[in-house]
Amino acid sequence: MTEHTSYDVIVIGGGHAGCEAAAASARMGARTALVTHRFATIGAMSCNPAIGGLGKGHLVREVDALDGLMGRVADAGGIQFRVLNRRKGPAVRGPRAQADRKLYAAAMQSAIRETTNLAVVEGEADDLIVVDGRVTGIKLADGRSLACGAVVITTGTFLRGLIHLGEKTWPAGRVGEAPALGLSRSLEAIGFNLGRLKTGTPPRLDGTTIDWGAVEMQTGDDPAEPFSVLTETITTPQIQCGITRTTIATHEVIRANVHRSPMYSGQIKSTGPRYCPSVEDKIVRFGDRDGHQIFLEPEGLDDSTVYPNGISTSLPEEVQLALLPTIPGLERVRMIRPGYAIEYDHVDPRELEPTLQTKRMKGLFLAGQINGTTGYEEAAAQGLVAGINAALAAGGGAPIVFDRADGYLGVMIDDLVTRGITEPYRMFTSRAEYRLTLRADNADQRLTDKGIALGCVGGERVRFHRRKLAALQAARAVATSLTITPNEAAKHGLTLNRDGQRRSAFELMAYPEIDFAKVRSIWPELEAIDPVVATHLEIDAKYDVYVRRQSEDVDAFRRDEGLVLGDIDYAIVPGLSNEARAKLTAAKPWTIGQAGRIDGMTPAALGILAAYLRREARRNKAAS
């Protein structure tokens, strides 16, 4: 798309959130600009070279279900695929892929380049243009101005980014790239109170100097399981990763120098991610352990750089050089680049509506680390939702809210806008109350129809989705129609309750010890079912009774979510306590359900709100 001076939507930042936001907006038909320093940095993996994992893999599948980019790009760049928790139930399994950094970035850049309605504008966004309380454009550092109907800010760690390496500090968005200073000032001028968060990265190692024979080797799954339903097979060559551990000697080096770590010297005062601690934090907090696991992850097929996952650190460079040889396999390793920590600005996510539009400024949307999250996948999911809603806002359409029963992206956004954060937010399956239905394997069944209705899913995905649903429905109909008595089942080696009742092939697969292969051996007509469809059918059967039970909880949840509070003046709602009024006014919840998730909100206050909404609805109906 040719560069213009006016767009429907402008997305600032070309990271994981920005790419999804820009592509989603463009798929919605909005003329979109992606503003980034350099096209060459689009899709860069700033930290670990991996996509997915526990909870995170669910988000990637949900992004894919809404025709997002991350799943397909990870499939193109993935060099080791593994499903985590494979021995556990499907609801908590997490697809993950080790990626080749160059292949991943190239695939993302290609996807952005090929997206209709999307232009990439190289430059630094320096200020927001605001007219009558609404964002109407942006100013670039080189003096250019771009007009628009909505802006999505996805700046990652660039907002007043400050790198820490031992006692040294310098401004940067990531190593080798300048921070974004103007946007922080612009957000503060609007009235946002910016907080500070911290993240870190480990040193990079020369893989040719690692003693691979001294470490455990880990292979990927064979065959590899793709992220995207549109990917038939993984064609990229696959690699092994190594596993080693820190030692007592490693811990001694760290303890002797921990006072030089910015986290412990007082140099860094912001909070880092709880579930991705630095190696010095591990030694201080878990000093009784004799070792901590390290995954040696190659960064590419033609790149000898290795990412040592598990030793993120901001200790001085000379200390990092001293601790590495104490680790088995790394005795003679060459450090290519030291690890470091980075602090950056973020906005309190309670300043956001569930659409990811800010409450204090119409037309302004935020996604990714600026909202207090950590991780590529969390950023991508937010970017997609923000991009869809920015396009809807620019076009005058009604916003879309994904709730906690829709998917992990709904869980994450609700957690952020309702509860806020005290540390970088990471997705886990344990955060979802409806995780039996929010599985990685059924993301398309949950979300693709919504995407089609919105207009962000089209083309080949629509045709594929409809064929898949039709095949699954047909397979379920066949499996439900085939029945057997307990006596007949016994002839096939199955032990069932001798109650005389006939059970279908679908019902039999609900038993833990009975899989699709077993029922197929009883009924040869099931052999015609596609293996992928058969896997979905078996999982649906295993969870069927629990899903039907959970659907009652979802219905009750959705009734509360259907009671929209809007812009209520809580000062005029009779019966509310002063404490409840203060909490509601500060949080500005979207629905009764969201109000109920505010810390300290009482059932009595919720009852008063529900009664008030009913009275207002009757009054408005009578007036009309």
UniProtKB/Swiss-Prot annotation:
This is tRNA uridine 5-carboxymethylaminomethyl modification enzyme MnmG. NAD(+) binds at residues 272-286. SUPFAM superfamilies: FAD/NAD(P)-binding domain. It comes from the Bacteria. The gene is mnmG. Belongs to the MnmG family. Homodimer. Heterotetramer of two MnmE and two MnmG subunits. One of its GO terms (molecular function) is flavin adenine dinucleotide binding. It comes from Bradyrhizobium sp. (strain ORS 278).
